[in-house]
């Protein structure tokens, strides 16, 4: 191997070495004989190349060869006291600036997070650091934040590497250089709609764009001084490199000669792609992935040891040895850094000035429209005591808004909301904005903050750093209209969406680690399914990748707007979705630099509610205004208390439906609590069960300390909301409002564990100083706060969501047919599939009519019944909800397309069918349909198999036969001139009909699949068990019979039962300790199944793959909600042929969402 001649150990007597001095004097280069150097042993070489071993940092120059070429050696005598840890021990005095580093935000190039790079630079005593990314400033804000938070005396230099024919590294000279480079990168990325394309102008044009405000680095990849001709000698710096690459010496010699010839300054860099040697192997893995190779295949073009790392000034001088020009380059690096360094907050923008009517300022206009809206919401000033209280709150809020200079922010949000209202788009503000009476008066939120007693300070306070945060929920189907309105209103250059940095998670990291190490794709897939089988070498590499950025995504709805082109602050690029541009920073980075974010979030339930309002208007003749609904209807709360909540916003999950019968909500505030209760924060904080016990009078209301009573009284001494945790910090630990807000932000931040650790010491000190709280009580209080780092809700957020809970429950109770149609039209959304939603509607007395070319619309629709008042008697029961009796309370007709429609029939084809029917009247034959609607054979066959041709007098099999006629029928042909009449064909069995419906539409209209299997299931315990299921093999199973889901609540608690159904979902919550929860559905309703870790391991194949299950287990129903803790799972479709037909056509469950 060639490494052994380039990397060596120089034999010497450590005792004879002089004591290291802080700075070595420059001496003339004197070559030493390489014969005096001793080659590395194989063990040492392997240690270097693999990234292991204490001596990895301690490679130093041993001599200057011909032409002053440098080689390196491993110096055991200096093994101690070097590196990031030892550097500080030796008292570094050699200034050095690393100006060409790459963090992990240089995607698939850097191997250390910006925080790690900054920490290493601080320990090494660097004067300045530049973290450059390829074609962007992806990590610039996080780098700047890391430096600010570290407290290090480290200057920040910003730059980027541009993807020209030969890559060009550019450093910005201060703020002006940064804005010019950001603009150039944005133009290059936006020049082509292809997101992955970058089109830079020519070098002369780049030099013109720089205007003398860039320094360009001339490194080994360029062999001429062309850059000098375009940028000028003062703006070109030669970059020499010490990277442990054997080619460094020759490259540096050529570059030095070029610098001398043209009078250019020289700097030196280790071109680090990681912070410390231990990350170099990861750098090599990422480099291989970048080239779409494994590490072995990429070896010829990647770094010999994976990557280089940060080095101190002393180390760089050691590497320079006796070479004067290399040593001078260390010093010059600091001078160049001083020329370029600046802090990123200098580019912070402002919001655009909002256009207001003549004679108004932004503040006076905000007061005017608030006055108008407040009169509508609360009544005129002085009209009542309640109105006076509201106006006093509004005036106080407006004073704070004026004091902080945020009127423009509120005007922009109001403008977006007004656009939605004017265009009949449902929207509402949520989150902390619901704490504001001004937001309520402006129509931004639907929660009355005054009546609800919400604190404005949670939303906005004088101590707050930065603007408030208003999230707008917009009906998902029309959110794009609002986004495009923002682009058109404020300009494409001044508005963009916020990025979401996609980071490595366990499965993705395992995949990429396996690829980098050269394993076969099939083997890697197996490891992602069975993580416990992953080899240590893959696991170790994958562990290093976790949480590293992989690529750029797009935030679900965050937009930034500013008073100048955003590209002057951060480059923009095209998003994957057409018509959207995105900045290169996530929401935290945008906030850190002062870009104000507006969240325009798509919410499926708002779309569903809009459809529900439209359906009731069209088919019942009633205009429903959501905000006028009476929130006290006892029947609606009684329905929810029975866990009759399929399709109801936020409370339809397994956990929520198990909680509803125990909580028994009776008031709107109970819904507020219900929304907040089943969240990771309250669950991890141990709040759920104590609250319910106290709510039901089974446990006394107590407080950990009397000082907590003001904050926790309304939730019975149990913390549920973020506002309460803030108040606890103020009352118990003496936090200021600003400190409490900092704590609250740490709760919701992605980086909250680190931030909250820094607050812990302050919290404990405050507890003892103010209230004498210490020990177990102090720990308990801190644990409750830490639990909310897993995203507990703010109360204002729960208030907003509770409104949607009530609205959706109201529609479900009064108009079940229209509500089901609304949910189907808003798909995909929610917890349940269209099949489950329709099955639930049938259990509530709704008749589901099949798809038909003569009766169906493009989408599913309720059947008009203007004379029929809504039914107020609902089926009873829990889970199963009972079977509806009597006349149907409504009818649903499946559509030709969309949810419940015919698979393979697009909306465009469905519109052609409806248009043809409206033009000529009802279709009378397949030929008629095909000709007038211009359908293909494939279209007609799909309609035939779905039973959509039933009104033509054809069975499904006859219709499929007749579909071939469509091949010759086209518009303009004489009717009846083609085709052959279908012969007599046998009908389909009930099982075949259900399987056909599931295969073609994904839903059944009449019978639930399990209903057809009931006669088999009733005898399940009498049937022989297949081999391997029971010890008796072919002996009867024995034991409990199969019961229906709706009977589980009536079975004595602790009884062993069997229950059967179609698997609707599988869940493994992070807070459940590995337990998996199943949903089973039969013709009577839903059953909750608990599968332990052990049972999952024993029956993994059945548990993971079965579509229809018989579950044996113990019923737990003592608290009003029934669950079955499974001890045996049996896959029905493998044991009953009819079940196999159904399972083969079933779309499957919604797993692990």
From Swiss-Prot:
SMART domains on file: POLIIIAc
Keyword Transferase carried by entry: yes
HAMAP family: DNApol_error_prone
Catalytic reactions on record: DNA(n) + a 2'-deoxyribonucleoside 5'-triphosphate = DNA(n+1) + diphosphate
Alphabetized GO MF terms: 3'-5' exonuclease activity; DNA-directed DNA polymerase activity
GO BP terms: DNA repair; DNA replication
Similarity comment: Belongs to the DNA polymerase type-C family. DnaE2 subfamily.
UniProt-annotated location(s): Cytoplasm
GO cellular component: cytoplasm
Broad enzyme group: transferase
Enzyme Commission (EC) number: 2.7.7.7
Keyword list, A-Z: Cytoplasm, DNA damage, DNA repair, DNA replication, DNA-directed DNA polymerase, Nucleotidyltransferase, Transferase
Keyword Membrane belongs to the record: no
Role according to the record: DNA polymerase involved in damage-induced mutagenesis and translesion synthesis (TLS). It is not the major replicative DNA polymerase.
Main location: cytoplasm
InterPro entries cross-referenced by the UniProt entry: DNA_pol3_alpha_NTPase_dom, DNA_pol3_finger, DnaE2, DnaE2/DnaE/PolC, DNAPol_HHH, PHP_dom, Pol/His_phosphatase_N, RuvA_2-like
Protein name (Swiss-Prot/TrEMBL): Error-prone DNA polymerase
Region (Disordered): 1-39, 64-89
Transmembrane segments: none
